[in-house]
Amino acid sequence: MGMLSPLQTLTKYWGFNSFLSSQEEIINEVLSGRDTLALLPTGGGKSICFQVPSIMLDGICLVVSPLIALIKDQVSSLQAKGIKAMALTSGMTLSEVDIALDNCIYGDFKFLYLSPERLQNKMVHERLKKMHINLIAVDEAHCISEWGYDFRPAYLKISEIRSFIEAPLIALTATATPDVVKDIQKKLLF
């Protein structure tokens, strides 16, 4: 593990001197290796809840996110801070995906972003097995629930990677009823 504390990591990369609401508690849960559900309002700093601990830990964080625009924003933001992050987006050729995954295995990337649909690819599975994944972050986790308003079937298959990736999982969402929370935890194998 790195030498910096969560707060020092936050200050170094984001320039903030304190955490918002329950961020620090969530980060400590993640650092202790527990599966965690982060229920924070929009603008509540959900991404910091997985980015800070992943920077502190050896290895790479696998981030599953449904929105290409959000993925591109987060990757650009991390890169601007000098943090190595990349995304597998739908516009990439098989060869580009192949090269990107190799870079994640042999390079010192900290974040790999991809959609739940891209995560279903067998080649992606094979390459993930070769990576030292420190955390699985599932953004917009309410999309896993059939109770939710923007259900995405590919989200139901995210838990399959837990059979070959031994890493804690953090599920993040701004909106979840108690039923949706239970559903998220069940479907992600908490």
What role is predicted for each listed range?
Residues 129-190:
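Post-DEXD/H (motif II) to motif III coupling segment of the RecA-like Helicase ATP-binding lobe
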Residues 33-52, 62-65, 173-176:
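Walker A/P-loop
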Residues 68-70, 92-94, 118-120, 142-143, ...:
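Conserved nucleotide-binding/hydrolysis micro-motifs of P-loop NTPases
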Residues 2-41:
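Conserved pre-motif I regulatory segment
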Residues 44, 51, 92-135, 145-149:
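Conserved helix/coil segment N-terminal to the catalytic DExD/H
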Residues 32-38, 59-61, 108-110, 167:
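Pre-Walker A (Motif I) flank of P-loop NTPase domains
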Residues 45-58, 71, 154:
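Motif I (Walker A/P-loop) of helicase-class P-loop NTPases
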Residues 61-63, 68-114, 183:
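Conserved nucleic-acid-binding Ia/Ib motif block in the N-terminal RecA-like helicase ATPase lobe
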